[in-house]
Amino acid sequence: MQRIDRTRFDVIVVGGGHAGVEAAAAAARLGAATALVTHRRATLGAMSCNPAIGGLGKGHLVREVDALDGLMGRVADRAGIQFRLLNRRKGPAVRGPRSQADRKLYARAMQEALAATPNLSLIEGEAHDLAVVEGRVTGIVLADGRALPCAAVVLTTGTFLRGLIHIGERTMPAGRVGEAPALGLAATLDRHGFGLGRLKTGTPARLDGRTIDWAGIEKQAADDEPVPFSSLTDRITTPQIECGVTRTTQAVHDLIRANLHRSPMYSGGITSRGPRYCPSIEDKVVRFGDRDGHQIFLEPEGLDDPTIYPNGISTALPEEVQRAVLRLIPGCERAAMLRPGYAIEYDYVDPRELDPTLQTRRVAGLFLAGQINGTTGYEEAAGQGILAGINAARLAAGSALAVLDRAESYIGVMIDDLVTHGVSEPYRMFTSRSEYRLSLRVDNADERLTGRGIALGCVGAARARHFAESQQALAAARARLDALAITPSEAARHGLALNRDGIRRSAFQLLSYPEIDWPRLAAIWPELAAVPPRVAERLRTDAAYAVYLDRQRSDIAAFRRDEAVRLPASLDYGRIAGLSNELRLKLDCVRPHTLGQAARIEGVTPAALTLLAAHARRADAAAPAEA
């Protein structure tokens, strides 16, 4: 990555957060001359809130970004200082890899990855305006007046669009602490008629770990065998650390209740919605009044950084109240507050303004990714960013744009949810959002998406080679399992109790039994001991879910049939007899691309779908004549 080496680009990405870096790197991997515009080079890849990657649902997104040769997984593996596999006791489909990260190491590793990316230039500056001619973006204008022409723009503005920080009664315009908001771009989007709304998020105070009484605090260790995010990572080499666990007390809750009138969420200073699944401590105290305490994870921000992130007490109370609250938390009675917590409000664009490609419908060549689309979280941003970057590069090259659907990825689930339903609060990924989650597991992200990425041009040679080798190893091991078989009598001699029905069962079928693991199989067939652990674990999961996956494949086939029925972009819903006015308004707002997407709009009835299918068939029949 160079500072700037040209005056015209194929793709310009605005914003260097988690969506922006993935968008820029993806576009560059496709061969597009790409510029990444950010206020300061030093903030590229910054973790603005919690120093962690992954988690339930989110870990799936990281694996999918990695499968498309994105950066987040590899960078998180380099910077991770506490790896834990969440939901380990539950089924493989809902387990979530998570890593506490060294904040400085993560940013440095991300910047190094970008620097090693060909076709990518860095421009330090503020994007102030879009150049739009006849409904198509032709470039951007920087705050210093420089015009940068291009074929496609990706906006990844995070919380910067008219960002406003709240700490008690005090407010300050900012995109995050110490950085100015993006006012010009917000005005530009207004001018072009985009539907803008306001959302809010928050962050807790930062503490000095040297002033915390760790002796009386419960410790949470990293996993003994860290599970990496990237399929290209053989093992984790970064030292692993412990986190602390403490709780709020009744005295904390009483103090917060006594000062609710000073919190902007309760004084009327903030009226926008925040993330439901990451509430402030004020919201926790109000919504869960019967609880005598709320868990707080004391998470170190780095191996050589004393800063502690107290996960669980995001707040916008006045600074002096925050200090008083700390005095009442076990272990934090003498903790020094390095920076107060705050809430931040920002503009977002109604994601129903987007196509599933993440291109806006109002301005051709303009793509949006990340919090500007109403999502929350680094991983959600990265998932959108990589698809937006791919499609921006493909548009610049004159190629067809790509869509990831619900049946192949959590990225597809997220984008379909956004463009179909919009948001009323910041959108967070959970495995429960997918109806195909047995098929969309963290262990098969490569199989689902890397081949697709190779076809799209976003996967480099090293990953393509690794993918081919791993698929060959998987296929060979599966073929061996299918070829090996045993009768119930033979199994009994090995200590396995099977139904005495005389039926020979393959090793793959045996692997579906909960009590039969890979070592038990290897005791019967010693050659299986040579199968790599990753391959063995993957095959055991496939075997355990085999019956259910067969059913799900049938469901996915039905889904794909509905997705194959395209609805004309010019379809006038107001002229379709039999649709209620309410449905006409909803359909006109979303403008579904397929019959399947229309079916997912709230209130759309089977009768309405029949009418839409009839219009789609008529449009298909008329297409050859029009051509």
UniProtKB/Swiss-Prot annotation:
Molecular function per GO: flavin adenine dinucleotide binding
Domain of life of the organism encoding this protein: Bacteria
Residues binding FAD: G15, G16, G17, H18, A19, G20
Record GO cellular component, one term: cytosol
Main subcellular localisation: cytoplasm
Keywords for the protein's UniProt record, in alphabetical order: Cytoplasm, FAD, Flavoprotein, NAD, tRNA processing
Coiled-coil portions: none
Cofactors (names): FAD
Entry's Gene Ontology BP terms: tRNA methylation; tRNA wobble uridine modification
Family stated for the protein in its record: Belongs to the MnmG family.
NCBIfam families xref list: mnmG_gidA
Quaternary structure and partners: Homodimer. Heterotetramer of two MnmE and two MnmG subunits.
Protein name (database record): tRNA uridine 5-carboxymethylaminomethyl modification enzyme MnmG
Source organism phylogeny: Bacteria, Pseudomonadati, Pseudomonadota, Alphaproteobacteria, Hyphomicrobiales
Gene assigned in the entry: mnmG
